[in-house]
Amino acid sequence: MSASDLTSVQAAAPQGSRQILVTSALPYANGQIHIGHLVEYIQTDIWVRTLRMHGHEVYYIGADDTHGTPIMLRAEKEGLTPKQLIDRVWTEHKRDFDSFGVSFDNFYTTDSEENRVLSENIYLALQEAGLIAEREIEQAYDPVKEMFLPDRFIKGECPKCHAKDQYGDSCEVCGSTYLPTELLNPYSVVSGATPVRKTSKHYFFRLSDPRCESFLREWVSGLAQPEATNKMREWLGDAGESKLADWDISRDAPYFGFEIPGAPGKYFYVWLDAPVGYYASFKNLCERNGIDFDAWIRPGSKAEQYHFIGKDILYFHTLFWPAMLEFSGHRTPTNVFAHGFLTVDGAKMSKSRGTFITAQSYIDTGLNPEWLRYYFAAKLNATMEDIDLNLDDFQARVNSDLVGKYVNIASRAAGFLIKRFDGRVQDSAMNHPLVAKLRDAIAQIAASYEAREYGRALRHTMELADEVNAYVDGAKPWDLAKDPANAVALHETCSVSLEAFRLLSLALKPVMPRVAEAVEAFFGIAPLAWADAAKPLSSAQPIKAYQHLMTRVDAKQIEALLAANRDSLQAEAAGAAAAGANAAKDAKSNAKAKPAAVNGADDAPISIDDFAKIDLRIAKIVACQAVEGSDKLLQLTLDVGEEKTRNVFSGIKSAYQPEQLVGKLTVMVANLAPRKMKFGLSEGMVLAASATDEKAEPGLYILEPHSGAKPGMRVK
């Protein structure tokens, strides 16, 4: 039996109370929560609520990820200490999670004494096991800020295609990867200074040790997701290949984080202490509530431990984290569940289009957070597939499913029951075949939730809602109410409808807990659990007056949401411009900090003759596929009106799924000299637009001509 099959069986027929620790990835404490983040927290929260409704002992743990160079520099930019920054962001994050009903048992911070002690103890245990190595490495160093620079804090000219303002490890124009030392005209993003090379002692976790490889090969066999297992096997390679590399776990001062014991001026890399933050947050909860922390995290513990993450951090959670735990004397995760990314209207979230939607803007615009919980759940399954928030579909699905199908059932029956029957159901109606069918379906729906097949659970629920509405339409209680002789039939119809509504509310409770709470108050019943499927409404407990449970989504609300996030971008741009002006003044006053002209002569006008040298052609994308081994590249097969198609590698993977591009027309540079790349020969370049500051305004957009253009046409 597979791990996913076992999960389904446990959901349908829980054998006693289980002890379960659940985490979501820790949000980084230098920005706002947006709807892309919420996919994961909503997914985890639904699973946690499902388990709680079985009566299991479940703890859902979270924290802000608070250490690292970006935090330190962001705080400096805002005139704050790092501690002041992370305290403010923690308050904002906690507010957003509360708004969306994310039910953490503890939401903490990695900048805590518990995390420092646990991180040190894990490090010292790994050191004792002979799994920590010391090495001298050469790095880029900012002579003005007197700090070593991570690759992403260096920019310059791509050594391959000569695009300007590219990061120190890869080019987002041509997709090439390279060493920071190969970058042309490099400069520090922090100060503008030209980096120098300096050596420094660093500390490494010896993941290449045969003990780690042997352990991970065994551990990977228990992963529930085939995609994760395949990726792990790709990273591990075949037996004897030794593909695992040692992991640099240290950073040099100045750095906001925990100093490594016995290594003054050296700090734990944020990715070492961040996952330890799961345990630190749980330990904080345990100490406040008298829970035996060690019983949950020691080897051989009967407690279960699950991590929900995005697929982009699978590497850290399925290689480093379990190996760190195994060789430091802790239990290892029971499983890791990864999800895909979120697109909005089929494209990467964009600040310029207003689709980079923050959690707070959603709330401020007046949208119901349970609408989004429902929509995401309807799209989620147990795989790593990306999901799309189509705003038109969002409006239509919420209005149809939740208002038209679900809420409508109660509103059609409650008034008659209160007016004609003192709010009391007909007990004999609780045995109606339709009620029995819904009651029997609850175990299947609960099993789908625990198997993380939320879309399947909700499809099943809405199919049942359709049957209930068909029953009401056929019985026509509004007609029955016209004749007192139909009182018994009317009573039965209303009673069946409301018991069906109770069962549908039970099925929807993990997704829409606030609506479920209102339903519980309406019926005057205790909080619903899965076992309550067998406890129908009773004439002994009259229902309360019906209160409207949910409004429809208005298109104007969606328009206001997009506008609010576009306005937010404009405010950011104004602030960035002011900051940029100040930075320019600072750079001017310090000549040695001035980079070699990044733009300089390149900004000078060119002649029409220069432009005429570039052969721009319309190209049709006839095939497109991801490039295995590259996080940035797509391989395009282009029809440019020649006898043969062209093969082009383009660094646009972050913005498009391959299937989105097939059949589209675009513009390519047709006379660019072919370039041999690691993955094959690239015979040109497709053109894409992006903002100057891609961090402030992320997004890549290929150029598309108007209809009528044909492959091979010149762009003049």
UniProtKB/Swiss-Prot annotation:
GO molecular function terms attached to this record: ATP binding; metal ion binding; methionine-tRNA ligase activity; tRNA binding
Enzyme class: ligase
Keyword annotations: Aminoacyl-tRNA synthetase, ATP-binding, Cytoplasm, Ligase, Metal-binding, Nucleotide-binding, Protein biosynthesis, RNA-binding, tRNA-binding, Zinc
Assembly behavior: Homodimer.
Name of the featured protein: Methionine--tRNA ligase
Role description: Is required not only for elongation of protein synthesis but also for the initiation of all mRNA translation through initiator tRNA(fMet) aminoacylation.
Positions of short motif 'KMSKS' region: 348-352
Cofactor(s) in the UniProt record: Zn(2+)
PROSITE patterns linked to this entry: AA_TRNA_LIGASE_I, TRBD
Organism expressing this protein natively: Burkholderia orbicola (strain MC0-3)
Main location: cytoplasm
UniProt-annotated binding residues for ATP: K351
Pfam families per the UniProt record, alphabetical: Anticodon_1 (PF08264), tRNA-synt_1g (PF09334), tRNA_bind (PF01588)
Motif ('HIGH' region): 27-37
GO BP, sorted A to Z: methionyl-tRNA aminoacylation
Enzyme Commission number: 6.1.1.10
Binding residue positions for Zn(2+): C158, C161, C171, C174
Keyword Membrane: no
Cofactor-binding details, from the entry: Binds 1 zinc ion per subunit.
Source species, domain of life: Bacteria
Cellular component terms (Gene Ontology): cytosol
